[in-house]
């Protein structure tokens, strides 16, 4: 339908029609028998409203920039003040007050000697950058063959080509194969489905041992990094003793550990 189609009697219908013609939604199903785009107009706290007035609990808020809730006036003021002062400037070989202050705050909140911050545009970009940095690190150390990355089945690390290669969800990967070579998969940390300890009261660390076995099976010379999700939304739980064990494993086998 055109923009002036008289059959489009509501703003919701007008926007939905425009979306059908021009908006290619992420993870959308491009079929004629699927209902049209639902138009989300506004948000407040943990809820969002569509153009027809229906309210929904926003269970996608953790994806990007609304973890603190919608409609926060102090956040809107801060964003407006920053845009009025300096809308954007790259931190290639420069710094600006907001980036400097935020990096210092993150270093203060981070444990141990994690005191340097490399900003990226989002999760996929962060994983891509971490894999590249791991490869560069070993190349500078005279070990250019260390290029592989170990990650878990069911783990979600992003949708760009490198991050998708490390991701362990086959349903979102197969249509893009072949992916970036060098991604090695190991079992997830799912105590309920673990073949060695699902009937035991305590975890046997089988999933941690599987990472060591995978690294040793690869060489371990070719392995640059192990990628882990301390908080998983797509796979299964990660237990604290797994993290402790894997940190020590990375030190023993000289592989980097990326959280």
Where are the model-predicted features located?
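Active-site-adjacent loop/helix segments that line or gate small-molecule/cofactor pockets in enzymes
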Residues: 2-44, 94, 99, 207
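Glycine-rich loop-to-alpha-helix module at the N-terminal edge of alpha/beta enzyme cores
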Residues: 2-5, 12, 55-143, 150
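Active-site and channel-lining beta-strand-loop segments
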Residues: 37-58
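A short, flexible beta-alpha/helix-coil linker loop
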Residues: 62, 85-86, 190-193, 230-234
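Short acidic, glycine-rich surface-loop motifs adjacent to enzyme active sites
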Residues: 218-237
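Catalytic PLP-binding core of fold-type I/II PLP enzymes
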Residues: 220, 238-259
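PLP-dependent aspartate aminotransferase-fold enzymes
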Residues: 104-224
């Amino acid at each position: 339908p055109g923009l002036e189609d008289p059959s489009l009697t509501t703003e919701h219908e007008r926007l939905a029609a425009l979306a059908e013609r021009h908006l290619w939604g992420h993870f959308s199903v491009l079929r004629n028998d699927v209902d049209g785009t639902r138009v989300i107009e506004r948000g407040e706290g943990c809820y969002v409203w569509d153009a027809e007035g229906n309210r929904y609990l926003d269970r996608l808020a953790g994806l990007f920039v609304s973890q603190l809730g919608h409609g926060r006036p102090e956040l809107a003021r801060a964003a407006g003040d920053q845009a009025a002062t300096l809308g954007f400037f790259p931190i290639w070989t420069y710094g600006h007050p907001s980036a400097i202050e935020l990096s210092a705050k993150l270093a203060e909140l981070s444990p141990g000697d994690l005191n340097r911050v490399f900003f990226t545009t989002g999760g996929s970009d962060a994983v891509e950058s971490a894999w590249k940095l791991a490869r560069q690190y070993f190349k500078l150390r005279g070990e250019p063959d260390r290029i592989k990355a170990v990650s878990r089945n069911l783990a979600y690390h992003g949708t760009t080509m490198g991050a998708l290669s490390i991701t362990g969800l086959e349903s979102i990967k197969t249509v893009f194969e072949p992916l970036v070579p060098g991604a090695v998969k190991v079992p997830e940390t799912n105590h309920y489905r673990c073949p060695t300890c699902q009937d035991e009261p305590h975890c046997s660390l089988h999933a941690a041992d599987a990472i060591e076995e995978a690294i040793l099976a690869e060489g371990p010379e070719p392995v640059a990094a192990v990628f882990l999700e301390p908080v998983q939304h797509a796979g299964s739980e990660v237990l604290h003793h797994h993290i402790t064990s894997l940190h020590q494993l990375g030190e023993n086998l000289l592989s980097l550990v990326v959280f």
